[in-house]
Amino acid sequence: MLTEIQEGKALNSVVKHITQEKINLYAEASGDFNPIHVDESFAANTPLGGTIAHGMLNLAYVSEMMTSAFGRSWLSEGKLRAKFKEPARPGDTLTINGKIDCVEQKDDVSYANCSFECRNQKGEMIVTGETIVKFSSDKK
């Protein structure tokens, strides 16, 4: 967890390798068995040309980064807005980076506004977005 919450501070990156097995396990956990995710034969005959990871799997990795930085504050008081740019595919290695853009205080509560991006090993943007985390001012 962050010991100091200040504007411009980078969050610890998360790096994850996407495999078909991870995609299949996520499908089981989420109940989302859309064939674009789990049926390689079906997906090969679509414009995407193969299976892709669930968007929410990618966001789970963003949430992992935010939980590492803000702990329970993220889990209970965090909000996320994301834009999906490209699909993540089996074989991709995703790197999720984030930073604190600004810290605002209202009464005895502080808010950290963060930005994040998720890129694959080719540097292609997969997901980008913003988060807001509410936390007690004494953690600042």
Predicted feature residues:
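Catalytic strand-loop segment that frames the active site of acyl-thioester-processing enzymes
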Residues: M1-A53
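HotDog/MaoC-like acyl-thioester-processing domains
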Residues: M1-N12, R89-K140
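A generic structural signal for short beta-strands and their flanking turns/coil linkers
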Residues: V14, K22, D32, S76-L80, ...
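Hydrophobic beta-strand-centered segment that forms part of the acyl-chain substrate-binding groove
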Residues: A44-A53, A60-I100
